[in-house]
Design a protein with these regions (language model features):
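Short, surface-exposed connector motifs at secondary-structure boundaries
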Residues: 90-98, 274-280, 332-335, 359
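Short acidic, S/G/P-rich loop/turn micro-motifs used as interaction or catalytic elements
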Residues: 105-107, 166-170, 287-288, 341-347
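N-terminal export/assembly segments and adjacent metallocofactor-ligating motifs
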Residues: 1-227, 231-260, 266
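Short beta-strand/loop segments at the ligand-binding rim of alpha/beta enzyme cores
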Residues: 188-202, 334-335, 356-365
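Phosphate/diphosphate-binding loops
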Residues: 12-14, 179, 183, 200, ...
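Active-site phosphate/pyrophosphate-binding segments
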Residues: 143-144, 216-329
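Structural motif
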Residues: 98-100, 160-164, 201, 280-282, ...
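Extracytoplasmic/secreted cell-surface and envelope-processing proteins
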Residues: 133, 170-172, 210, 290-291, ...
Length: 376
């Protein structure tokens, strides 16, 4: 008989509540937890594929301790987990300890990290793809102490302008909630519902899932996205009187590179302004901070903040993996705990881990495989 349990899968951009089916203690199927209404029981491709990791033939089968032989070859000896925890407790008490992990929105992990930092342990994060760059840039530009994440409330939006933001695909955060809330505004059960539908304008470099359902789509090179955003912002901020003359002149100058799309931009702005507080402008997380700021300014001018979009503060760490490497070189970090990921492999092009490992007195790696990061 199958058994079921509730869990969640944290990631760098959020977490997904799950229901896992298991047989004889082995998970066999992953589905979304229907009790979490924003996602409606849906999952993403990564959650569905995660069960395969449990059956990876290269998955580590226990705890190991590295022993360096005189020949220079490393040999792995299987040891008890309790012995590793005992040595870890002793080493942590000596100070100069750092934690290195992937970015995660796990609330439990955040709580534990705060307790560790209270004892003087430094915390660093690294991801192969930095999805949080736009959040940090926007937060810095707005004078916030932390990063600022744009969280659209598409269930309340009647007009949406997407600037290379695939909010229905897996390129942006919160895509499951976005899909459920946005598509809820496109249901037509009778002829009268057509007038109540939301309307989507998409400007993008390639065909995305979001572009596939757009009412109006403009194909535009990513290199021209800043110019187009400036073009739209100049007209919208001018009509709402939300910017002074000097700024508008500067925006028009920047938007000259997209002047051929002036008619498209003007029609879009007119439609956005026809639904104040029910319109929203979304910028792709990969776009530069100038576009992020322009999207914020347009949402503020539309009265959308708090209505169709929220800006929330995100957590932060003591620094990047580069700052960690510098602290190790300077002798300020002597003990390193690596939580998941494979940072040694992903950063070997710009961090000399062989040199750093000579300065580290103690390294513990928590992971599912014996890989490059385990070798240090």
């Amino acid at each position: 008989m199958p058994a079921y349990y509730a869990t969640s899968q944290p990631s760098s951009r959020g977490y997904i509540p799950l229901i896992v089916e298991s047989h004889q203690g082995r998970p066999t199927k992953v589905e979304g937890n229907p009790s979490y209404l924003p996602y409606g029981g849906s999952t993403d491709i990564y959650s569905q594929a995660s069960v395969l990791d449990l059956y990876d033939p290269d998955r580590a089968q226990g705890s190991f301790s590295r022993q360096s032989l005189k020949s220079g070859v490393n040999r792995w000896k299987k040891v008890s987990t309790s012995s590793i925890l005992e040595s870890l407790t002793e080493e942590v008490s000596n100070g100069k300890v750092a934690l290195l992990a992937n970015h995660s929105h796990s609330l439990t992990r955040q709580s534990l990290i705060q307790k560790a930092k209270a004892k003087g342990i430094k915390f660093f994060e690294h991801d192969v793809v930095d999805y949080c760059s736009a959040e940090r840039q926007l937060g810095k530009a707005l004078g916030a102490k932390l990063g600022m994440r744009a969280v659209p409330k598409l269930g309340s939006a009647k007009r949406v302008l997407s600037l290379d933001n695939d909010f229905l695909g897996n390129r942006e955060a919160n895509e499951l909630a976005n899909s459920k809330s946005f598509m809820g505004g496109r249901k037509v059960l009778n002829p009268g519902d057509a007038k109540k539908m939301n309307r989507l304008y998409v400007v993008e470099a390639d065909l995305s899932r979001t572009g596939g359902v757009a009412d109006h789509r403009l194909r535009l090179d990513s290199s021209a996205m800043t110019a187009f955003a400036s073009l739209v912002a100049a007209e919208l901020l001018s009509k709402t009187k939300a910017a002074d003359g000097a700024l508008l002149t500067h925006l028009k100058k920047l938007g000259a590179g997209a002047k051929e799309h002036q008619a498209w931009a003007s029609e879009t702005v007119a439609d956005l302004l026809s639904r104040p507080k029910q319109s929203v402008v979304l910028a792709g997380s990969h776009l530069p901070k100038e576009v992020q700021l322009l999207a914020y300014a347009m949402n503020r001018a539309l009265g959308s903040i708090g209505q169709t979009i929220d800006y929330i503060e995100t957590n932060h760490t003591d620094g990047s993996i580069d700052s960690l490497a510098k602290l190790v070189k300077d002798g300020e970090i002597e003990r390193l705990i690596i939580l998941g990921g494979n940072p040694v492999y992903h950063t070997k092009g710009f961090i000399n881990w062989e040199e750093l490992s000579k300065k580290l007195k103690y390294v513990v790696r928590l992971g599912s495989s014996i890989d490059e990061s385990s070798q240090i």
